[in-house]
């Protein structure tokens, strides 16, 4: 912070040697202070400009914005919010005040939402703010799904821009919904724009009329009724009972549940990792009464028996896990010092210890693991960036004995629910901006190696338990919710409420049990 005496001189207008004017109002300041923070003022006062010795400088900005920026140069303090960040950024970009530029960019990333994503995307294009563009683009499909009134009121130019931005990253039905919903608000007036909107979508309507294009899109959106599929599961097994640690069998269709067993430790066990293999649930690592532990327990669902397994070779909490090829992999997580680790451990029944596997590309915890195309993938998670906890958008996969990076998620997020459903990889919900749950659902496209937005769950949730049950994708619980939802490939619907064990990396699987 600039020394207090200089700030006092500024407030009193003492020893000032330059006058800044905005909207006809003047602010007296010191060239030295302005030059120390602004490259624009430094070059102006020290270069060969005609204004070098001018005592009055006019700025094309509102008075409040100019005063706030000058106040920042004396105090390094400024209040940014969604009502002033754009005007502040425009001015400091012109004045070349790098620390405040960075501060504004950080604020943009926290205030962008469905309401302002179109406007901020255009603002980001004007100043080439790549991260803001990415976040604003990510929210556009959510605007289509969750902000119908705002969509109907959108201008043709804004809708056209949005279609161009989302057409390659969302399921086609979402883009078609945006077009038809917008036209239906005033069919007589808006239907004539259907050919133009089809072009924005990447379609080639040729000589087709706007009426024909609109009719075709309405027809394409009709949902075909699928044939009835016989049930081959009758329950989902997961760890329920909130913090009570009860292995529970749930019938998702009726909401009825049966407690199969309660684990044996009396201590408070949390932050452990659960994984399923061959009707056996394994619980590894975590903390007992807040103390890191390496213990591993297993519960045989069919035999209703508990067993101790070899301890982990390292302390591990909030790790991801997946079982494949008869092996269990424990991936990432926090070490004994609560720092994300980049190590992988593996074990199979019959081994007397855990072995070290390939090293992750990025140390990560609170990530989600899934098997996709016979490879283990981990999506997002929490990292330490320059020693500061943060979330990541990095996706990694274990291929040929080596972890490699895959195209990143739409935005950084942790505690997502990763599920393969109908041979497609889905990423449901998660926690963004540290601990804010989201209801975004994205799907990986193998043809473009990109993630596409395919809808939103009814409830925002992070850290939910998920599995496929009788040809539908289910998610249970999550951050601050006991709700569950199911997805048939077209729409999400609320299902029966459940009580999942939180403060852990839980797991669930569908099976058939004689209850």
UniProtKB/Swiss-Prot annotation:
BTB domain: residues covered: 16-82
Keywords: Kelch repeat, Repeat
SUPFAM superfamilies per UniProt: Kelch motif (SSF117281), POZ domain (SSF54695)
Swiss-Prot/TrEMBL Kelch repeat ranges: 280-326, 328-374, 376-423, 424-471, 473-512
Transmembrane segments: none
Family, as annotated: Belongs to the poxviruses Kelch family.
Annotated source species: Myxoma virus (strain Lausanne) (MYXV)
Name of the protein this chain belongs to: Kelch repeat protein M-T8
Stored Pfam families: BTB, Kelch_1
